[in-house]
Amino acid sequence: MSIAMRLKVMSFLQYFIWGSWLVTLGSYMINTLHFTGANVGMVYSSKGIAAIIMPGIMGIIADKWLRAERAYMLCHLVCAGVLFYAASVTNPDMMFWVMLVNAMAFMPTIALSNSVSYSCLAQAGLDPVTAFPPIRVFGTVGFIVAMWAVSLLHLELSSLQLYIASGASLLLSAYALTLPKIPVAEKKATTSLASKLGLDAFVLFKNPRMAIFFLFAMMLGAVLQITNVFGNPFLHDFARNPEFADSFVVKYPSILLSVSQMAEVGFILTIPFFLKRFGIKTVMLMSMVAWTLRFGFFAYGDPSTTGFILLLLSMIVYGCAFDFFNISGSVFVEQEVDSSIRASAQGLFMTMVNGVGAWVGSILSGMAVDYFSVDGVKDWQTIWLVFAGYALFLAVIFFFGFKYNHDPEKIKHRAVTH
């Protein structure tokens, strides 16, 4: 089996695990375990907390002491055990702590999977800019397959979804043992204090361009959290209108939302072209504009024929909004940093997006939703327009604040030699 195909299998399983429970665990906790909304919010907050703490630390470990593929294997082994136990938990406080441990083991694997992929591609003499996006496509496919499998097997309200995730984690942990060895960075004769402490990636903040990049990564991470948290409740709220109570949107909101992940597959494949043709600045600007459209279409969408088309368009542009930021950003970090701190830098990127950004996004977006709610009834149109305005504001500031001169040949050369 070629290295590209082996990495595709890894990517598929990586996101299959997440797709097995991420979308449906909330419904299981509310409907089966009878947790309150606050309980569910507390459990899901574990993702942001873990993402702040763990990816950078695990990246440093993978750079300095433990081979990346071994760190990856150990993390998924922990996830397998924790998810298996989580299936038997019925207390909300215990569920928070159990899922926090799971998140602390799982969140670093996102960055580690990127680092392992880039290193394996480099060892094989392949161009990461061209070879990585098709590999990542299989991650999205894995997420969709898991989500639909749980839905079609009617396990949305069952603890069996956690057993499925546990089994997939155990399988991926074993599979990681078959991956090529990723060498730990050689220690230099003269090292800085930051290097001795394993804080190399944090030195990137001394570079104004990288500092601005990570700042916007955090702010766009907040945008991603908005749609993760409030997309499904928004669609469910159409049930308040008798005209839409029996509509497809109300009955199968998760299936409609899964179109967003499907759109990712197509947009991922366009990343090599857009990155080489236009560069990271234009690609990230396109992402911010896509987020503006995502929220704008939500503002005017509903289950009517015309409104459904707008909702569907919102799902489609999500593919561009998500991929052109997350995947392109990861490739940009890969190209801009020294290979000795690659895993640390990828971990820092994930920390800013899924940690700080997710935490800030949860708090501020929740405040915005409450502000535009009266007696429990949410003014969704105004809420989505506010979020659209935020995304558009980011695009304008990024256009003037991020300095980047695109050189297609330089990008190609650096991608091959890293």
Q: Model regions: which residues?
A:
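Juxtamembrane intracellular "pre-TM" segments in multi-pass secondary transporters
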Residues: 1, 180-215, 240-245
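Helix-loop boundary and gating motifs at the non-cytosolic
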Residues: 1-48, 209-245, 252, 326
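Multi-pass alpha-helical transporter architecture, strongest
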Residues: 6, 85-89, 169-181, 355, ...
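Hydrophobic core of transmembrane alpha-helices in multi-pass small-molecule transporters
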Residues: 12, 82, 92-112, 116, ...
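Cytoplasmic membrane-interface "Motif A"-like loop-to-helix N-cap segments
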Residues: 63-76, 276-288
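C-terminal ends and interior cores of transmembrane alpha-helices
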Residues: 77-91, 289-304
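Cytoplasmic helix-loop-helix junction between adjacent transmembrane helices
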Residues: 100-138
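A membrane-interface helix-boundary motif in multi-pass transporters
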Residues: 152-168, 367-391
